């Protein structure tokens, strides 16, 4: 089953297809529709048609699963036990899951701190750091791992700075990502200026007592310098856990590689999530259709494929298969949000955008719940969900989805764009990116010239310097660094009300940002109900390269490094 896509394919998307998928997009979509239709011709036809219209995108693991080289799973979340046997087993499991193509996260809260009989967590994390260079994701790119640790762990202070390049190289973990599980109690201590105890999870003894505010400031300083650690508001996440899973005594102990998955882990349970994303840029085209229902069914079929095929590849998937079969959680997300707003000339950091994101995601949630209830009637409830009338414990999670967005020629995820014109660097090389809606508006004003575009790139993708551009359009095309980050957080909080999992939420601050404002924005994310914060991006203030010169002389193209996180 093949068909031509009805949206333009960029040169960058074409290069990615050629290098990683060896197929034209229409043929690839046809193959995927057949594979994940569950044997239903009508669903296969709809999936093919909706994909070719650019209404949604598959995650990279699902795209590559047609080659048979890996599993269609994006995320694996592993509990790390406090025993030598458990630590060795964790290493073995993460290696195999990485080779199977998934990103891996480890939840380290329960591993004891350093003592006369224990070296603590950092040396064990160092072995994981080495593994990521050796055990490649899907055998095509270096492995990816995120470690999560409690805000009260004795190793926390060293953990926070383990990705900074100075210090003992044997205790640095530059190949890993990391996140801190932050509790409500800690945040209240920060607000009140109280002390905070770092407590050994094994003995219960207080290892250190520190100022909560100073620890908070240290975390933010490290985020500002390196982009990490992620912040994972663990109590908020656990409040959103499905009640059936709570009744089983399960709890969330961390997030995933991209901080949007919030599922329970345990010694016998490795959380799994498969992903797909609707394209909000084309929301007006699909809003009255059954797109969301079709994608929920498709992702449930992906889960079943994993349950059926994973044990045949390695026995080290047993915990993941148990979790996937038991709760059948999926992660339907979104991309193209910035482009949708630009299409309709709505500023990203506006009250109207906050209102619209609530309306749109309320509708997506309602459709997803209808779909999982229908699947429960047709196929049965998941074993962990008996009596709740649903097939899938969790349904919605907004991932970064940069590669999926690239294939569809839209903006990634639900975040603002870094600029209206820039050099976009991905795993297939560097390409020039020009905002099509700004081009539309510049054409209408007689400003679509090489000189204007060169000035935009020279000003880090900004249009604020263009005198002939009306203020109303300058607001629409603000870069992510020109926006009020508090409005971005408020918008994310409105969206979070309708997400059973989370969202990869980035923040953007210029070099020299006010420390008080930085802290206030992060605290607002916690107070307003966001489950976590992903990267903190900083703008280094360098100018871009002449985009049209790069087009004429591709051999001289340089990569834009203006914005670093």
UniProtKB/Swiss-Prot annotation:
Record-listed substrate binding positions: 60, 74-75, 103, 256-260, 400-404
Gene3D superfamilies: 3.20.70.20
EC number: 1.17.4.1
Disulphide bond pairs: 75-273
Site (Allosteric effector binding): 82, 112
Any one GO MF annotation of this record: ribonucleoside-diphosphate reductase activity, thioredoxin disulfide as acceptor
Tree of life domain: Viruses
Positions bearing the site annotation: Interacts with thioredoxin/glutaredoxin: 560, 563
Name recorded for this polypeptide: Putative ribonucleoside-diphosphate reductase large subunit
Organism: Frog virus 3 (isolate Goorha)
């Amino acid at each position: 089953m093949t068909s031509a896509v009805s949206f333009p394919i960029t040169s960058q998307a074409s290069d990615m297809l050629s290098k990683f998928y060896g197929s034209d997009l229409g043929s690839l979509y046809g193959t995927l529709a057949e594979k994940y239709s569950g044997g239903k011709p009508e669903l296969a036809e709809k999936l093919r048609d909706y994909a070719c219209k650019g209404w949604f995108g598959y995650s990279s693991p699902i795209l590559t699963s047609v080659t048979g080289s890996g599993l269609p799973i994006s995320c694996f979340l592993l509990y790390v036990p406090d025993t030598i046997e458990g630590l060795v087993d964790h290493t073995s499991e993460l290696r195999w899951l990485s080779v199977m193509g998934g990103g891996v996260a480890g939840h380290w809260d329960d591993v004891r701190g350093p003592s006369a009989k224990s070296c603590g967590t950092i040396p064990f994390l160092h072995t994981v750091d080495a593994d990521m260079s050796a055990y490649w994701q899907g055998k095509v790119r270096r492995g990816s791992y995120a470690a999560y640790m409690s805000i009260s762990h004795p190793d926390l202070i060293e953990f926070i700075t383990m990705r900074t390049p100075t210090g003992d190289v044997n205790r640095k973990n530059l190949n890993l990502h990391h996140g801190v599980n932050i509790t409500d109690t800690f945040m209240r201590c920060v607000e009140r200026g109280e002390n905070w105890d770092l407590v050994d999870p094994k003995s219960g003894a207080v290892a250190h007592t520190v100022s909560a505010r100073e620890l908070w400031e240290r975390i933010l300083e490290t985020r500002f310098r390196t982009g990490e650690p992620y912040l994972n508001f663990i109590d908020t996440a656990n409040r959103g856990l499905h009640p059936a899973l709570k009744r089983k005594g399960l709890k969330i102990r961390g997030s995933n590689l991209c901080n949007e998955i919030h599922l329970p882990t345990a010694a016998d349970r490795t959380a799994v999530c498969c992903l797909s994303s609707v394209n909000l840029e084309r929301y007006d085209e699909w809003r009255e259709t059954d797109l969301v229902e079709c994608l929920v069914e498709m992702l449930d079929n992906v889960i079943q494929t994993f349950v059926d095929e994973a044990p045949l590849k390695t026995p080290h998937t047993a915990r993941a298969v148990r979790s996937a079969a038991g709760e059948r959680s999926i992660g339907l997300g979104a991309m193209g949000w910035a482009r949708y707003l630009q299409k309709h000339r709505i500023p990203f950091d506006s009250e109207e955008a906050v209102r619209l994101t609530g309306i749109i995601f309320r509708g997506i949630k309602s459709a997803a719940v209808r779909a999982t209830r229908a699947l429960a009637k047709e196929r049965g409830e998941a074993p962990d969900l008996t009596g709740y009338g649903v097939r899938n414990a969790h349904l919605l999670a907004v991932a970064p989805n940069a590669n999926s967005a690239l294939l569809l020629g839209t903006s990634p995820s639900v975040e603002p764009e870094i600029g209206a014109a820039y050099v976009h660097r991905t795993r297939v090389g560097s390409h020039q990116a020009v905002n099509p809606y700004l081009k539309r508006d510049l054409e209408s004003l007689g400003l679509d010239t090489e000189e204007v575009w060169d000035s935009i790139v020279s000003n880090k993708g900004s249009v604020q310097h263009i005198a002939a551009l009306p203020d109303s359009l300058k607001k629409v095309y603000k870069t992510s660094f020109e926006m009020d980050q508090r409005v971005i957080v408020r918008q994310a909080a409105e969206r979070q009300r309708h997400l059973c999992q989370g969202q990869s939420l980035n923040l953007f601050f210029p070099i020299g940002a006010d420390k008080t404002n930085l802290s206030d924005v992060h605290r607002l994310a916690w107070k307003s109900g966001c489950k976590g914060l992903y990267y903190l991006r900083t703008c280094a203030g360098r100018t871009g390269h002449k985009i049209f010169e790069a087009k004429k002389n591709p051999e001289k193209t340089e990569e834009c490094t203006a914005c670093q996180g």
